[in-house]
Amino acid sequence: FLVDTNIGKASFLEWQEWIEAVNDDLPEPESISEIWDNLPELAKPLIDNVLRQGHKMLIAGPSKAGKSYALIELCCAIAEGGQWLNFSCTKGKVLYVNLELDRASCLHRFKDVYTAMGWEPSNLSNIDVWNLRGKSIPMDKLAPKLIRRAAKKNYIAIVIDPIYKIITGDENSADQMAHFCNQFDKVCTELGCAVIYCHHHSKGGQGSKKSMDRASGSGVFARDPDALLDLIELEPTEELLKQEENKAICAECLAYLKRYYPAYTQDLSQDDELSSAVLLDYCHKMLGNNINLELVKTAIPAAKQRVRQRTAWRIEGTLRE
């Protein structure tokens, strides 16, 4: 017996669309009226006033600007519950995915950062490093492997440095970069942790561009993250360098006076302690010839050299909230 006709789909494509429609795993729409009086709590801060747990942050800057050092310092600050760029960090476990440095150089950098910051390495167990130099794969293939390895580690942040090693597709294509950035959302959602990554500036002058437009490639890079920090180098003026040299000379002179002639506080005013000329003259009178010679010939030239080696940077932040 013929029961009925024209009750199915006209083609395989229609059947495929129907199956996908009934089996999708997307959440259902919700009415705002039902949650108006019982709004969910905001995610807790990971970096105070900058980034929340479970959110994404991009650090952009010119090549060889020290982005990796900044991210390693951030890992250490999260592990120790310290400060990063004067922002307090929530203490917790962090995974640093190293795609660029060789293993030895990467591990040495962590110790160098601890030493330079003067931090006691009390919570090194909070830092895990996944060295993937030479083993990079596109992000859409890396994300499932990353989620599987990090699933039970209770990380509150995953740092990926840098992303150009794992970009899927053309970085200038908006739709391809949208698919690429969706992988970060997948990691955030599956693991409940923040994802922090860095990218380089485009070629050419950056001064005329907004901070959001400096990252190389599609504008998706600027629109996708919840927080965007952009590093731009400043050119110190000669006047500023001389001012910093004056401070450095004063610091060296005062260090020698505290060590060899503590009674200097009775002779020098606060204004005198800010003048390198006054302090050098005072040291010449009060310190012995050998000590003064060591100060003038060794300590002060070294202090001046350290000042001349400094670079100046501005960090511009663009936050979604």
Model-found features: residue ranges?
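Phosphate-binding/switch region of NTP-binding enzymes
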Residues: 58-59, 64, 68-69, 157, ...
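Pre-Walker A (Motif I) flank of P-loop NTPase domains
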Residues: 53-57, 91-93
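Helix C-cap/alpha-to-beta connector motif
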Residues: 84-87
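Hydrophobic positions on the alpha1 helix immediately C-terminal to the Walker A/P-loop
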Residues: 70, 74
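Conserved inter-motif catalytic segment of the P-loop NTP-binding fold
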Residues: 34-35, 42, 47, 89-175, ...
